[in-house]
């Protein structure tokens, strides 16, 4: 024991000597002027109109800050690798040594700590050389240097750099009206290209993620995958860098250091917990973008969610399973993802699906994060050091029971106060609503009651009878013969490929589905694999529904096809006995519905550009499959529609119309599902190709919409029938 203690003491003395030597060595190691001094020089040059001086100083300030950041990262990463926390797990003292064992363990721990500190001191240099005040750090975070630079570049006729600097500043300060005016001015100048408007401070992981999501939303999964995978790689790099930058000096929060009085272990605890808090908050920092008021929720897990869908859409089920299982690491009880996994198991086989595991990088990330959370919640419970968990996926068992009870009590108090305030506000709102509701309802009904255009079509239910707004049910849109012909088309076309591109989620394993898009049907007709006239009928019927929707809802802007397909769903008989799921759970077509909070977030992966939706039924000889509207809680059913040949349901795609489809429990349900947009930029590319193919294949006479003649456009609004569509009274992810 004496020999071991002597070795430790010798090591500690060597560390102290190395640290003092590092003081001398490092002073010459940092020769760059600090960012705050360079920023001050730049502002002074700006004040006297020295534009080249502004450019020189501000560019150097940005480079200096970047160099400091790189130095911290390099030093902390290298020293952590060279001097890890290592306690000898195999060393266990004998009973005779027990009295001194604890002291030796402490010396071993602090010996490693001192060695790493000496390494950092030698690598970083004097603390004063790389410290910025909180105010100066804020200036750089606000991208203030680019505000000065854009003016200076403009003054010295460096237009391309001026545009980039202005855009970079505006991305970080989207409310800055003067910079918006500058950018508008730059756009009018000759010689300015779209590529000049670039963000010089963009984070690679966020750039790749946003690009991947945009491609996914534009129904280009093949192109989206490499960007989403790159976003993951860049995320983990940025995450480790962010964590390393957290290992700075202790923040005393203003002048609290004057009263700070802690012993050795309390001081270590305070600083270490502050560092852990910072590391956990890297989740929020990396999920933030200046263009958004709030960070992306569940940012890292959402990567695997998008990838799972994208891999599914391109037919790579193995990768889809891996991403689904990785997502389930964070949300093991997610109903939709578990259904997706069951679907993949049915496609790939149970054994093969079991052999695919979640990604190791995500497993390690989750394990480390949970261990840190345990320490942070323990410190919150015992020492009262607050910790706000940035993740929604943290298991409840990580939080100490006493803290759970305390948080539950606080939440209940907050909810009670909120409810009391809400009740008062609701009483006021009710009084106002009662006075305006009747006039608004009359206005909406009058607005949406346009002509149905074609003979034989009858209005069955309007918004009032459907207990909502912007809703309609029509009968007689197509004939029985046309229903049968289109149903046959689906069954024949499916043998040449299901044509089902662009769906946002795998479907229930309790039903088989197959379908065909308009363009695919026409191509198969051109190749002689399906009757060409049937494919042409399909094309004409979709155009007919589009015109009816435009007319009935009295739209001032034309509707464009966003996505359309003819699809049949067949119940698998042997799995219907204990079935509890829907064909499609309740959702909203252009936003992500959170039924618990009654909020629908209009952002990808939702198809945010969709404005109106319609479904045209081809048959009713099956059990189940009823379409239903609900409130935002996804539980309160407001109306239900029973499918039958020629019946169409139309509605606006927003939060006013959450809807779902009940399970098909026997037989086959066939329908044409259509989504429309008012924005021509999101017009379906397949539809444009279909239009061109129809012009090539058919004469102008054959291209007429149908042999039916439109009714007089000046006719009065049709009157709805009064009976319930489902034959009974209405009782209180992305196909219709």
From Swiss-Prot:
Residues at the active site: 669
SUPFAM superfamilies, per the entry: TPR-like
Matches recorded under SMART domains: P4Hc
Amino-acid positions noted as binding Fe cation in the UniProt annotation, renumbered to this chain: 587, 589, 659
Enzymatic reactions: L-prolyl-[collagen] + 2-oxoglutarate + O2 = trans-3-hydroxy-L-prolyl-[collagen] + succinate + CO2
GO cellular component: cytoplasm; endoplasmic reticulum; endoplasmic reticulum lumen; extracellular exosome; membrane; nucleus; protein-containing complex
Pfam families with a match to the protein in the record: 2OG-FeII_Oxy_3 (PF13640), TPR_leprecan (PF23557)
Main location: secreted
Coiled coil: 401-439
Subcellular location: Secreted, Extracellular space, Extracellular matrix
Domain (Fe2OG dioxygenase): residue spans on this chain: 564-678
Post-translational modification comment from the UniProt entry: O-glycosylated; chondroitin sulfate.
One MF annotation (Gene Ontology) recorded for this entry: procollagen-proline 3-dioxygenase activity
EC number of this enzyme: 1.14.11.7
Keywords, comma-separated and alphabetical: Coiled coil, Dioxygenase, Dwarfism, Endoplasmic reticulum, Extracellular matrix, Glycoprotein, Iron, Metal-binding, Osteogenesis imperfecta, Oxidoreductase, Proteoglycan, Repeat, Secreted, Signal, TPR repeat, Vitamin C
Motif residue range(s): Prevents secretion from ER: 733-736
Residues carrying covalently attached carbohydrate according to the record: 316, 467, 540
Signal peptide: 1-22
TPR repeats: 35-68, 143-176, 205-238, 301-334
InterPro entries the UniProt entry points to: Leprecan_dom (IPR056585), Oxoglu/Fe-dep_dioxygenase_dom (IPR005123), P3H (IPR039575), Pro_4_hyd_alph (IPR006620), Pro_4_hyd_alph_FE2OG_OXY (IPR044862), TPR-like_helical_dom_sf (IPR011990)
Keyword Cell inner membrane set for record: no
Family assignment from sequence similarity: Belongs to the leprecan family.
Protein name: Prolyl 3-hydroxylase 1
Gene that produces this protein: P3H1
């Amino acid at each position: 024991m004496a020999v071991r203690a002597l070795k430790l003491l010798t090591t500690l003395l060597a560390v102290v000597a190395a640290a003092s030597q590092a003081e001398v060595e490092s002073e010459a190691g940092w020769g760059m002027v600090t960012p705050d001094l360079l920023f001050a020089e730049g502002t002074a040059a700006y004040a006297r109109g020295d534009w080249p001086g502004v450019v020189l100083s501000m560019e150097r300030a940005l480079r200096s800050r970047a160099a400091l950041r790189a130095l911290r990262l390099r030093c902390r990463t290298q020293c952590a690798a060279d001097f890890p926390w290592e306690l000898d797990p195999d060393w266990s003292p004998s009973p005779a040594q027990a009295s001194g064992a604890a002291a030796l363990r402490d010396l071993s721990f602090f010996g490693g700590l001192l060695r790493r500190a000496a390494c950092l001191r030698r690598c970083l240099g004097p603390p004063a050389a790389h410290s910025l005040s909180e105010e100066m750090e804020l200036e750089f975070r606000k991208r203030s240097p680019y505000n000065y630079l854009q003016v200076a570049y403009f003054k010295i006729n460096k237009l391309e750099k001026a545009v980039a600097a202005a855009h970079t500043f505006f991305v970080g300060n989207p409310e800055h009206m003067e910079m918006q005016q500058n950018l508008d001015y730059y756009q009018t100048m000759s010689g300015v290209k779209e590529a000049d408007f670039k963000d010089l401070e963009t984070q690679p992981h966020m750039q790749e993620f946003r690009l991947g999501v945009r491609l996914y939303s534009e129904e280009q999964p093949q192109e989206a995958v490499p960007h989403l995978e790159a976003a993951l790689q860049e995320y983990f790099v940025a995450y480790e860098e962010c964590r390393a930058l957290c290992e700075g000096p202790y923040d005393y929060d203003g002048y609290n250091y004057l009263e700070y009085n802690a012993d050795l272990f309390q001081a270590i605890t305070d600083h270490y917990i502050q560092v852990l808090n910072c590391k956990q908050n890297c989740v929020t920092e990396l999920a933030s973008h200046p263009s958004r008021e709030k960070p992306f929720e569940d940012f890292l897990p959402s990567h695997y969610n998008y990838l799972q869908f994208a891999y599914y859409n391109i037919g790579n089920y193995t990768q889809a399973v891996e991403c689904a299982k990785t997502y389930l690491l964070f949300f093991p009880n997610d109903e939709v993802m578990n259904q997706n996994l069951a679907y993949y198991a049915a496609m790939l086989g149970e054994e093969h699906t079991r052999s695919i595991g979640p990604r190791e990088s995500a497993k390690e990330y989750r394990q480390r994060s949970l261990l840190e959370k345990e320490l942070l919640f323990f410190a919150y419970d015992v020492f009262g050091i607050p910790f706000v968990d940035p993740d929604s996926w943290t298991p409840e068992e990580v939080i100490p029971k006493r803290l759970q009870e305390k948080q539950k009590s606080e939440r209940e108090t907050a909810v009670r106060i909120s409810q009391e305030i809400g009740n008062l506000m609701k009483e006021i709102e009710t009084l106002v609503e009662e006075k305006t509701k009747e006039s608004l309802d009359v206005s909406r009904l009058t607005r949406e009651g346009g002509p149905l255009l074609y003979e034989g079509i009858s209005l069955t239910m309007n918004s009032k009878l459907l207990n909502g707004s912007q809703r309609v049910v029509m009968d007689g849109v197509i004939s029985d013969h046309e229903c049968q012909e289109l149903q046959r088309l689906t069954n024949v076309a499916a043998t040449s490929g299901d044509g089902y591109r662009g769906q946002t989620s795998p479907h229930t394993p309790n039903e088989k589905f197959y379908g065909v898009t308009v363009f695919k049907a026409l191509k198969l007709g051109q190749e002689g694999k399906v009757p060409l006239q049937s494919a042409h009928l399909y094309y004409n019927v979709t155009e007919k529904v589009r015109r009816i929707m435009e007319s009935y809802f009295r739209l001032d802007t034309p509707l464009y096809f966003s996505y359309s397909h003819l699809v049949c769903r067949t119940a698998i008989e042997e799995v219907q006995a204990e079935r509890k799921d829907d064909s499609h759970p309740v959702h909203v077509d252009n936003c992500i519905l959170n039924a618990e909070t009654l909020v629908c977030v209009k952002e990808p992966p939702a198809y945010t550009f969709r404005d109106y939706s319609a479904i045209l039924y081809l048959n009713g000889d099956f059990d189940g499959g009823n379409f239903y509207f609900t409130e935002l809680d996804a539980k309160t059913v407001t109306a239900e529609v029973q499918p039958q040949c020629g019946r169409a349901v139309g509605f606006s795609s927003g939060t006013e119309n959450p809807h779902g489809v009940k399970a098909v429990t026997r037989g086959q349900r066939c329908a044409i599902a259509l989504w429309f947009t008012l924005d021509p930029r999101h017009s379906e590319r397949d539809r444009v190709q279909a239009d061109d193919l129809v012009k090539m294949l058919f004469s102008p006479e054959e291209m007429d919409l149908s042999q039916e003649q439109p009714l007089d456009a000046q006719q009065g609004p049709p009157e709805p029938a009064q009976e319930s569509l489902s034959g009974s009274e209405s009782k209180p992810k992305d196909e219709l």
